[in-house]
A protein has these predicted regions:
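Positively charged
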Residues: 1-218
Length: 218
């Protein structure tokens, strides 16, 4: 199965899934995603990357392929710069800020709600997949790097990265200003502020309490 490389098509936010009503479709998508991950030797793959605009993806945990439906990030810790590639943007590398310790919630293909704590590479891959579901690409928000960057001095690389991080902050403030002008935007910003409180620990999230007996999917 071919991977979608049309960046315009991938810039659309994916639709949430009613697992109960769309159960057969969800199972079919999961099979297609897993087959594509195996075929191309990927760490992960989202439904939009195979031309299906639904909120689900598969992550390859050392050969154990897990399916995540309607996934969200409930809480985050830590921060680091991640060097990433994307099968939809072949031949290019990017630097992207990521949290390295996250609590997540999602549904299995059977509709069961589960929660997990992901750290390190697993956390970064999950965030990469969430970006795809939100129509956000590395080429939009990442810092593209090449041999010139690799061969630069450490001081030069730090300067480039700092300029990139400052530009991200400016973009975020511009988006927030635009959102404040609409009712929908105000509601979204209210949700963002709530999540920021969660991230700062002002509101606690207990994955064990939210999903007792969470197991593996499929």
């Amino acid at each position: 199965m071919d991977i979608v490389i049309d960046l315009e098509a991938l810039s659309v936010r994916a639709d949430e899934i009613n697992v109960r009503k769309e159960n057969k479709e969800v199972r079919d998508i999961a099979v297609k995603l897993k087959n594509a991950v195996r075929e191309h030797g990927l760490a992960s793959l989202s439904a939009p990357q195979i031309g299906i605009n639904k909120r689900m993806f598969v992550i390859n945990f050392n050969g154990d392929l897990r399916t995540f439906v309607n996934p969200i990030i409930a809480n985050v810790k830590g921060f680091e710069l991640s060097q990433e590639t994307c099968s939809s943007i072949p031949g290019k590398r990017f630097i992207r800020p990521r949290h390295n310790d996250i609590n997540v919630m999602y549904q299995t293909p059977l509709g069961k709600i589960e929660s997990k704590r992901l750290v390190g590479m697993a956390a970064k891959v999950y965030q990469h997949c969430i970006d795809h579901l939100d129509g956000l690409l590395l080429s939009d928000v990442g810092l593209e790097i090449d041999e010139l960057f690799d061969n630069a001095t450490e001081e030069e690389r730090v300067e480039v990265i700092n300029m990139y991080l400052e530009s991200l902050d400016i973009k975020q403030k511009a988006v927030e200003k635009d959102l404040e002008g609409t009712d929908e935007g105000k509601r979204l910003l209210s949700g963002v502020k709530f999540m920021e409180k969660v991230q700062k620990g002002e509101i606690e999230f207990d994955p064990e309490q939210e999903s007792e007996g969470a197991g593996t999917d499929e």
